[in-house]
């Protein structure tokens, strides 16, 4: 173990992962469809680690305006990668939910593993 730490979270956990990136000194963060994140963009300038966001294009909980606000703010901050998955809904990575999408989940999982390997 090299002592480096990442946070990974889904939905509310995605928001918590984002807040850890901004406030805790983790070395990397992955945030899957973080609900209501647009209400917490004041924390973005505090992010000091690489952060990866996964958003569902058809998300009923995080609309396209919220994703656009995150994209705009993170472009200013410069610490984030943002991936959007077309045709899928909130929870696309959870096999126990009706919104589960195996292709999008596999793609997001692979991207997360590469991101973590590159940043830890």
Spans of model-derived segments:
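N-terminal cap/leader regions of alpha/beta-hydrolase-fold enzymes
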Residues: 1-120
């Amino acid at each position: 173990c090299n002592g480096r730490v990442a946070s990974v979270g889904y939905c509310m956990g995605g928001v918590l992962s984002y807040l850890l990136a901004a406030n805790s000194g983790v070395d990397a963060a992955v945030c899957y469809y973080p609900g209501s994140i647009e209400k917490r963009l004041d924390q973005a300038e505090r992010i000091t680690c690489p952060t990866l966001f996964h958003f569902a294009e058809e998300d009923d909980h995080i609309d396209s305006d919220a994703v656009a606000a995150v994209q705009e703010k993170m472009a200013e901050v410069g610490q984030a990668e943002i991936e959007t998955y077309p045709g899928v809904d909130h929870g696309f990575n959870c096999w126990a939910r009706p919104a589960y999408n195996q292709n999008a989940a596999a793609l997001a999982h692979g991207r997360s593993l590469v991101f973590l390997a590159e940043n830890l």
